[in-house]
Amino acid sequence: MTPMLLSAFWTYTLITALTPGPNNILALSAATAHGFRQSIRVLAGMSLGFLVVMLLCAGIAFSLAVIDPAIIHLLSWVGAAYILWLAWKIATSPAADEKVRPKPVGFWVSFGLQFVNVKIILYGITALSTFVLPQTQALNWVIGVSILLALIGTFGNVCWALAGHLFQRAFRHYGRQLNIILALLLVYCAVRIFY
């Protein structure tokens, strides 16, 4: 992977892991309402579910690459389009609402939620088909990057849980500006895929 593509990969994965989404909001809510220690079960369920979903995404993306390598080039365009769509959604979304507080859930519920979490499914397929499979189709690399993607996602969840009220205040005061900056960084990611 070239340094430019690697920088786009890290930018995409970190922004996706750290921007608001179902997991991060749930982690924030659980830690804010019940403390970090009480939210560990929720975080553990999310993390294991995230890993399983990333491995499933690896299997799907790898299988498509084996069936027809030209699909990977097409998926790169689809991935870039998704990244641009995500940038648009982030740039035009309102700041987070600190009044929205879902009830904390347990390990198995947070594990199961990963299988319907469209954000992480698209995150996995986009990262693998856009940044990894065009460079290598070695199964050990695909699996290794899938594990890395799950670790990055877990990092994002833990950051939100640890930050608790601090992130709520930042999004309340600077949410629009932060959303625009994150959106511009995602546009950078989409451009770096091809140049």
From Swiss-Prot:
The keyword NAD does not apply. It holds the Pfam family LysE. It comes from the Bacteria. It catalyses: O-acetyl-L-serine(in) = O-acetyl-L-serine(out); L-cysteine(in) = L-cysteine(out). It is found in: Cell inner membrane. It is a multi-pass membrane protein. Coiled coil: none annotated. Residues 33-46, 91-104, 163-176 are cytoplasmic. GO terms for cellular component: plasma membrane. One of its GO terms (molecular function) is amino acid transmembrane transporter activity. Keywords: Amino-acid transport, Cell inner membrane, Cell membrane, Membrane, Transmembrane, Transmembrane helix, Transport. The chain crosses the membrane at residues 10-32, 47-67, 70-90, 105-125, 142-162, 177-194. Residues 1-9, 68-69, 126-141, 195 are periplasmic. One of its GO terms (biological process) is cysteine export across plasma membrane. Exporter of O-acetylserine (OAS) and cysteine. Belongs to the Rht family. This is Cysteine/O-acetylserine efflux protein. It comes from Salmonella paratyphi A (strain ATCC 9150 / SARB42). The gene is eamB.
